[in-house]
Regions:
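Signature of N-terminal electron-transfer/Fe-S-associated modules in redox systems
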Residues: 1-156
Length: 156
């Protein structure tokens, strides 16, 4: 089956067809940035974009994404190696502690900023409510999203 991951055409052999998108990304396509945590779509650690929409990849059978565009955290880095404004904001605001939830948090934040270029705290909290952070860095997550919104607004 064929799909596009981070802008690159990829092929997944038929013997992977019963696996989740998350498993295929991590174990077959060697893209470990998307994290496994709860396995039931309730924590947000495994969020990727499928055709532009944020989805918990642990819930999606790989056979359901044939022919679709998948964007993972690895796909946010520019070809010149520069970080996406959200990734840089995460660093600038010292968001990560354990870092486990960060890829899913960033992918969910990207979806928010693609819909709302100037979110307030309530907008951020609402958009990010499905993403859990065991370390409780929610204030820094809010700050980083606002910082990225400013930078992304200047780039447009």
């Amino acid at each position: 089956m064929k799909l596009k991951v981070n802008g690159v055409a990829r092929e997944v052999e038929a013997d992977w067809r019963d696996e989740s998108l998350l498993t295929v990304l991590r174990e077959h396509l060697d893209l470990p940035g998307t994290r496994f945590s709860c396995g039931i779509g309730q924590c947000g650690a495994c969020v990727v974009h499928i055709n532009g929409a944020p989805i918990s990849s642990c819930l999606v059978p790989i056979k359901d994404v044939a022919g679709k565009d998948i964007l993972t955290i690895e796909g946010l880095v520019a070809q010149d190696g520069s970080l996406h404004p959200l990734q840089q904001a995460w660093i600038d605001e010292s968001v990560p502690q354990c870092g486990y939830c960060q890829s899913g948090q960033i992918m969910q934040a990207l979806a928010l900023l693609q819909e709302n270029t100037n979110p307030n705290d309530a907008d951020i909290d609402n958009a990010m409510k499905g993403n859990l952070c065991r370390c409780g860095t929610y204030d820094r997550i809010r700050k980083s999203i606002k910082r990225a919104a400013i930078v992304m607004g200047q780039v447009r």
